[in-house]
Amino acid sequence: YPFFKKLENAKNKKVRIMHYGDSQIEGDRISGRLRQRLQREFGGNGAGLFPVIPATKKISINNSVSKNWVRKTGFGPYIDKTINHKNYGALFSFCKIKFDTLLSDSNSLFNADITINIPNKSYKLCRNYKKLKLYYSAKEKVTFRLLLNDSIFHIDTLSKTNEITLKRLDFSETPKSMKLQFSSNKSPDIYGVSLEGENGVIIDNIPLRGASGTEFSKVNYSSLSQMQKLLSPDLFILEFGGNTIPYIKSK
């Protein structure tokens, strides 16, 4: 089987596993144990892909955000009716900056940030990572700053793009604290952040509460495809249960 051959070579190349499921895998349940065992055996570090605002807390990550971030969800009974498109990417959700309409005009700049600290309750290998990957699209240019341990590490501009785009940053050792800062007059859409090692196994924990597993056919294929090509997964695990059972009304 090709996947197991890739696992054998994982210490020299990344192997990505995307674990989708319903609420039974929330909080990194199952994914976390599987990640720890495979990373210990075949190499790898980091918690993998997660949204700016997770639906529930995960032991594998330790992040916080400024209060002006909002989450837009595209699965189960939680679909945001204010969104007039289905471009949700691989996590079936995205996050954006909520602007104050009373203060905003075409020249107003708004700021938001994401703080990521080393998790203190995760498995050991989740606490080490040397790569940060940001998946986004932007209607206007966005000033982006990355602070490591309260010192500016990188300043850049996220280009205007309708497609989901990857911003990648590498560092020599795991920072105790990272702060991602965004400044723009139009919010970017952030589809996910990934923390990874140089090589080895990456396992993404993607819980979709209330989902039946049919969501793959309900979102925009182009958006999903763009992000999946950037992620380049080697294996999908689909773990859906009771939400797939049709409701039957007795007469």
PLM regions and their residue ranges:
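N-terminal, post-signal-peptide region of Sec/Tat-exported proteins
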Residues: 15-16, 25-27
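Conserved SGNH/GDSL esterase-like catalytic core that processes O-acyl groups on lipids
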Residues: 26-147, 157-251
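Membrane/wall-proximal cationic-aromatic binding patches
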Residues: 1-19
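Extended, alpha-helix-rich binding/interface surfaces that flank or overlap catalytic cores
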Residues: 22
